[in-house]
A protein has these predicted regions:
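Flexible, low-complexity junctional segments that flank or bridge functional domains
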Residues: 1-96
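Conserved acidic, small-residue-rich alpha-beta core segments centered on
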Residues: 91, 96-98, 102-227
Length: 228
């Protein structure tokens, strides 16, 4: 790519938290593995396993749903998850339902449609107890789901403006290159869900993400909803 003059090493300059510059020579390590920051394990958004799931908070009497990609888990179909979630709502009668789309880059928006249809006529929608979290990593079909939840279920959007535009290309597919095995993703459809609108989906309540919160394992968005 022409970024470095040699493939053996590169000198990088970093700015630390004290606003001082630090230079370091980095060398490639084919065995290196990325590790999550220890504080990230404290965040509820990263605690659940799989693409989607629910966590019931007994103390707060709320259900937290994480939805990390708009795709089916072959071992755990979304229809099964939807049925289990609706059962939990019926049995627990939570005060709030939170659907986290902050780290969802898209896929197939129609997967969530049956859940949205089921929530539309429920008390969580009518009493404005449904919260949808959006942010800079909310793209494509996840953005469409957020808009549907807002329009059909009167969901309250919390977080940051989406990186993806309201009107955009989506329904992502992918294929693998034969020699490099690199995965290429591409969009197959254009969605104009808000005619004439230009730009991101803006939350009803904006709460900026910060490095300091991440380092402390703190989720200011969830803390705000807990206080409501």
């Amino acid at each position: 790519m022409g970024i470095t003059q040699t493939k053996d090493s590169i000198t990088c300059t970093f700015l630390n938290t004290d606003h001082k510059t630090i230079s370091a020579v980095l060398k490639p390590d084919p065995k290196a593995k990325l590790r999550k920051a220890p504080s990230s394990t404290e965040l509820r958004a990263f605690k659940g396993k799989g693409i989607y799931g629910q966590i019931y908070d007994k103390e707060q009497n709320l259900i937290y749903v994480y939805y990390r990609s708009c795709q089916q888990d072959k071992k755990y179909p979304f229809s099964t998850f939807t049925r289990e979630l609706l059962d939990t709502i019926a049995n627990r009668h939570p005060q709030k339902l939170i659907i986290d789309l902050r780290y969802n880059g898209g896929g197939n928006s129609s997967i969530m449609d049956p859940l949205i249809d089921s929530l539309q006529n429920g008390y969580l929608s009518h009493e404005h107890k449904l919260y949808v979290l959006i942010g800079k990593q909310t793209f494509s079909s996840a953005l469409l789901n957020a808009m549907s939840l807002k329009k059909q279920c009167q969901a309250i959007l919390v977080g940051e403006a989406t990186a993806g535009s309201v009107n955009h290309y989506g329904e992502v597919r992918k294929f693998e290159l034969p020699y490099s095995q690199a995965i290429v993703t591409y969009s197959t459809k254009y969605f104009e869900t808000w005619k004439g609108h230009d730009g991101a989906l803006i939350p009803d309540k904006t709460i900026p993400a910060s490095v300091e919160d991440f380092k402390r394992g703190r989720d200011s968005v969830l803390e705000y909803i807990y206080r409501q």
